């Protein structure tokens, strides 16, 4: 399994989410970047809904207690194994005793680690996702911290076609996006001209208020 040496800023166990309980007030939770998480699982031979570790901004440091094949996808948070850079979107063998760490935020804000065979995390209401607000799912319903240990369900030190288990760094599309807008209950407070201007204008996102 893995031993958490440092939990980082916000590191949780997530899968594709907990569906069917919204009417009781339980949110779906799940990974923020479904594409990156799915690709990580595919690279190590898992089902795409298998639980992964989701890392936000400043990543964790973890020690492996047994051999395991992993894949790191998503943003570039400076993943290293024993100080050597890890290629993202590739299946990689981590040996027992080695340490996986994340050294910074170089591109993107979230990264994902998939583990061949999955993590030994209990299923709660059909999902292994962590719901921090409700303290449900994942690892004791909370983010990972120093001293936490998670076992692997079916670790693998070898997978067929290892050299081919790689996916080129994906493009997340053009710089311009067309957004879908749903009109609200007060849309009749605006003129037709105003609504037309709103729907057909170009907007720029910035860090200015």
Residue ranges of predicted features:
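Conserved "landmark" site that anchors the functional core of diverse proteins
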Residues: 1-209
């Amino acid at each position: 399994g893995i031993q958490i040496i440092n939990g980082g800023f916000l590191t949780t166990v997530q899968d594709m989410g907990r569906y069917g309980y919204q009417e009781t007030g339980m949110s779906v939770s799940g990974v923020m970047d479904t594409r990156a998480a799915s690709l990580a699982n595919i690279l190590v031979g898992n089902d795409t809904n298998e639980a992964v570790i989701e890392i936000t901004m400043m990543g964790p440091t973890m020690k492996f207690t047994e051999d395991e094949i992993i894949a790191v996808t998503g943003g570039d948070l400076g993943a290293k194994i024993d100080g050597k850079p890890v290629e993202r979107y590739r299946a990689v063998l981590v040996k027992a005793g080695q340490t996986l760490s994340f050294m910074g935020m170089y591109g993107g804000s979230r990264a994902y680690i998939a583990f061949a065979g999955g993590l030994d995390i209990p299923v709660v209401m059909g999902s292994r996702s962590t719901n921090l607000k409700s303290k449900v799912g994942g690892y004791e319903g909370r983010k990972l911290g120093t001293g936490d240990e998670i076992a692997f369900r079916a670790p693998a030190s070898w997978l067929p076609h290892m050299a081919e288990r790689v996916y080129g760094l994906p493009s997340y599309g053009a710089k311009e996006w067309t957004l879908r807008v749903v009109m609200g209950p007060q849309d009749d407070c605006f003129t037709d001209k105003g609504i037309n201007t709103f729907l057909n204008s170009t907007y720029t996102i910035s860090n200015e208020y």
